[in-house]
A protein has these predicted regions:
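Amphipathic alpha-helical coiled-coil segments that mediate homodimerization
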Residues: 2-25
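GAF sensory/regulatory domain recognition
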Residues: 25-48
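Short hydrophobic/aromatic beta-strand element in the GNAT-like acyltransferase core
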Residues: 22, 86, 99, 112
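Sensory-domain boundary capping and coupling elements
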Residues: 103-117
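Regulatory sensory and allosteric helical modules in signal-transduction proteins
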Residues: 45-81, 90-93
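Juxtadomain coupling helices with adjacent low-complexity linkers
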Residues: 7, 117-155
Length: 155
């Protein structure tokens, strides 16, 4: 099992430090090139356990997963350019996004924090703060990735 209280506590730390309307934590499953939702502030719209494979533009995967760098979309145009679910994102009054990779031992990508708020809510300082908080998700994601990898090898 993941540690939902840990991820919920991380959500609160993000809320207190930079603000957030929509917060999800996704585990990276390399064997399937899929992102598996481990935590969601909006479980009706973004249910825990949901997976994304082709919803995200290749440039985003190159940046966040391959290069292990944050993605920053300051406004709705940037969100629309990258995310297929931009209409749902906009319906939640989110127009600015920070995606931060969560790294494990050996700089292996364990997953991604998705932090969204109103347009122009974030800046370079927000990205730095988000990066500093990302390691707090590593224990829960490490456990989830290991469990999902074992399940995937049995199918």
């Amino acid at each position: 099992m993941t540690e939902p209280s840990t991820l919920a506590e991380l959500e609160e730390k993000v809320r207190e430090s930079i603000g957030v309307r929509l917060f999800t934590v996704l585990a990276w499953i390399p064997a399937r090139r899929a992102l598996h939702r481990a935590h969601s502030s909006h479980p009706e719209q973004y249910p825990v356990g949901g997976e994304k494979t082709v919803e995200v533009a290749a440039g985003w995967l190159d940046r966040c997963i391959e290069a292990k760098e944050p993605y920053f979309g300051p406004n709705p145009a940037a969100v629309r350019e990258i995310f297929a679910d931009h209409e749902l994102i906009e319906s939640l009054h989110c127009g600015s996004i920070i995606n931060v990779p969560v790294l494990g031992e050996g700089d292996v990508v364990l997953g991604v924090l998705n932090i969204l708020d109103a347009e122009d809510s974030y800046d370079d300082e927000s990205i730095s703060v988000a990066r500093s908080l990302a390691p707090l998700a590593a224990p829960a994601l490490r456990e989830l990735v290991a469990r999902l990898s074992v399940q995937g090898s049995r199918t």
